């Protein structure tokens, strides 16, 4: 298993790096050049930089990921593609994307886009909380322990 992180706006990178390093599982952070950092990463953690274009990180992750790899993303489109490839996919708020829930998530995203296109406003996501982070940590640890 390898871990790929859609890292541009991922609030749980620290959890992923800490837990994966302890378990000696390689992590690849995929992020745009606009988030460039020369900060040192622990052994087993690689950062791949991609252009800032829409979905560039998603395409790179899909190019690299193999069946049964673990992907962390908040992007439903990437999650859908990764599930079809046989990957395990987690959201940073601590839930696992499945073939059973992805269609509903994509449908909700589409309907919200149509509402916004018509000029109306939709609710944004709820703020990320410490409880969300701990929920993610528990799920992540249970997945990498398998």
Curated annotation (Swiss-Prot):
Pfam families with a match to the protein in the record: DUF188
HAMAP family reported for this sequence: UPF0178 (MF_00489)
Family per record: Belongs to the UPF0178 family.
Full protein name: UPF0178 protein BCE33L2782
Natural source organism: Bacillus cereus (strain ZK / E33L)
């Amino acid at each position: 298993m390898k871990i790929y992180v859609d890292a541009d706006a991922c609030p749980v990178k620290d959890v992923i790096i800490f837990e994966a390093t302890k378990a000696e599982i390689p992590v690849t952070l995929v992020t745009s050049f606009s988030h460039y950092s020369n900060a040192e990463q622990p052994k087993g953690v690689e950062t791949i930089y991609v252009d800032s274009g829409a979905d560039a990180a998603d395409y790179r992750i899909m190019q690299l990921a193999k069946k049964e790899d673990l992907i962390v993303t908040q992007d439903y489109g990437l999650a859908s593609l990764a599930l079809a490839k046989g990957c395990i996919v987690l959201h940073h708020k601590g839930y696992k994307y499945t073939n059973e829930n992805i269609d509903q998530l994509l449908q909700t995203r589409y309907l919200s886009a149509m509402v916004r296109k018509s000029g109306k406003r939709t609710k944004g996501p709820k703020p990320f909380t410490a409880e969300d982070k701990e929920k993610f940590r528990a799920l992540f640890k249970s997945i990498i322990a398998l």
